[in-house]
From Swiss-Prot:
InterPro entries the UniProt entry points to: NAD(P)-bd_dom_sf, NmrA-like, NmrA-type/Isoflavone_red_sf, PCBER-like
SUPFAM superfamilies: NAD(P)-binding Rossmann-fold domains
Catalytically driven reaction(s): (-)-dehydrodiconiferyl alcohol + NADPH + H(+) = (S)-isodihydrodehydrodiconiferyl alcohol + NADP(+); (+)-dehydrodiconiferyl alcohol + NADPH + H(+) = (R)-isodihydrodehydrodiconiferyl alcohol + NADP(+); (2R,3S)-dihydrodehydrodiconiferyl alcohol + NADPH + H(+) = (S)-tetrahydrodehydrodiconiferyl alcohol + NADP(+); (2S,3R)-dihydrodehydrodiconiferyl alcohol + NADPH + H(+) = (R)-tetrahydrodehydrodiconiferyl alcohol + NADP(+)
Family recorded in the similarity comment: Belongs to the NmrA-type oxidoreductase family. Isoflavone reductase subfamily.
GO molecular-function terms, A-Z: oxidoreductase activity, acting on NAD(P)H, oxygen as acceptor
Name assigned to this protein: Phenylcoumaran benzylic ether reductase TP7
Tissue-level expression: Expressed in flowers. Expressed at low levels in stems.
E.C. code: 1.23.1.-
Keyword terms, alphabetized: NADP, Oxidoreductase
Superkingdom, natural source: Eukaryota
GO BP, sorted A to Z: lignan biosynthetic process
Ligand binding (NADP(+)): G11, G12, T13, G14, Y15, I16, G17, R36, K45, R137
Length: 308
């Protein structure tokens, strides 16, 4: 069997980064995490770094804004995965420049991990946030860097514990607010599974210069189907309040930041159906649960079961 690629994760202590680092280490890839000195003095982040070390991850000290440290780190690996947060997405141009200079990278995964930004019709302010990811994609392609874009749609941990109810901390028990008509399908993926599928793609020629869509059939549900599943689990019918699209668009315009970004993403997801309103063509994409049927993914039903 071919040797597994050495993987460097940048942004590994962030929300989705932790799961990608863990999946990489557990699957036997020599795994490296680029960590800033300041991260080590953060009590929460330093615990995450300790956990990485226990998994056998090599911690490299460096910074996105220090070109030399970046090139030095990149030269030690074969694959770079960026899991940076929204505020740093545009700065991935620095990463692209370092990858180009290092000249040894077999694959780059930019920070995506949401809906396919080339296929969305999101309104502002989500439109501008997605546009940054689009710019990064075009820059990667222009430089001829081999890539995989991971489109995992909704993080289960963001959406399912509250079922997208404003201000809630638990799933609804009495009434539920449903955006649009509730018939549009969205996709919900558990974060460990996102990490697992991402790492499976690292050495897979089928995912080279393609978008890897994580769209397992059991996790592709409309809002109405989600509510019906939850009602069955708790043995109770909820009062349903449907919010028309006009009202959502008005709320996006009048709410204080950062709410409009969240509302605009939810509008694209649950009203426009931007995660499921196109067919995956072999020319641009592949679907993870089809490529890797051996992965026992967490279904939405399994996930919601913890909250009954």
């Amino acid at each position: 069997m071919a040797e597994k690629s050495k993987v460097l994760i940048i942004g590994g202590t962030g929300y989705i980064g932790k799961f990608v680092v863990e999946a990489s280490a557990k699957s036997g890839h020599p795994t490296f995490a680029l960590v800033r000195e300041s991260t080590l003095s953060d009590p929460v982040k330093s615990k995450i770094v300790e956990n990485f070390k226990n998994l056998g991850v090599t911690i490299l000290h460096g910074d996105l804004y220090d070109h030399e440290s970046l090139v030095k780190a990149i030269k030690q690996v074969d694959v770079v995965i960026s899991t940076m947060g929204m505020m740093q997405l545009g700065d991935q141009v620095k990463l692209i420049a370092a990858i180009k200079e290092a000249g040894n990278i077999k694959r780059f995964f930019p920070s995506e991990f949401g809906m396919d930004v080339d296929k969305t019709n999101a309104v502002e302010p989500a439109k501008s946030a997605f546009a940054v990811k689009v710019q990064i994609r075009r820059a990667i392609e222009a430089e001829g860097i081999p890539y995989t874009y991971v489109s995992c749609n909704c993080f289960a941990g963001y959406f399912l514990p509250t079922m997208v109810q404003p201000g809630a901390t638990v799933p609804p028990r009495d009434k539920v607010i449903i955006p649009g008509d509730g018939n549009v399908k969205a996709v919900f993926n558990e974060e460990h599974d996102i990490g697992t599928y991402t790492i499976k793609a690292v050495d897979d020629p089928r995912t080279l210069n393609k978008t890897l869509y994580i769209k397992p059939p059991k996790n592709t549900l409309s809002f109405n189907e989600l509510v019906a599943m939850w009602e069955k689990m708790i043995g109770k019918t909820l009062e349903k309040i449907y919010i028309p699209e006009e009202q959502i668009l008005k709320d996006i315009e009048t709410s204080p930041m950062p709410l409009p970004v969240i509302l605009a993403i939810n509008h694209a997801t649950f009203v426009k159906g931007d995660q499921t309103n196109f067919k995956i063509e072999p020319s641009f994409g592949v679907e993870a649960s089809e490529l890797y049927p051996d992965v026992k993914y967490t279904t939405v039903e399994d996930y919601l079961g913890h909250f009954v």
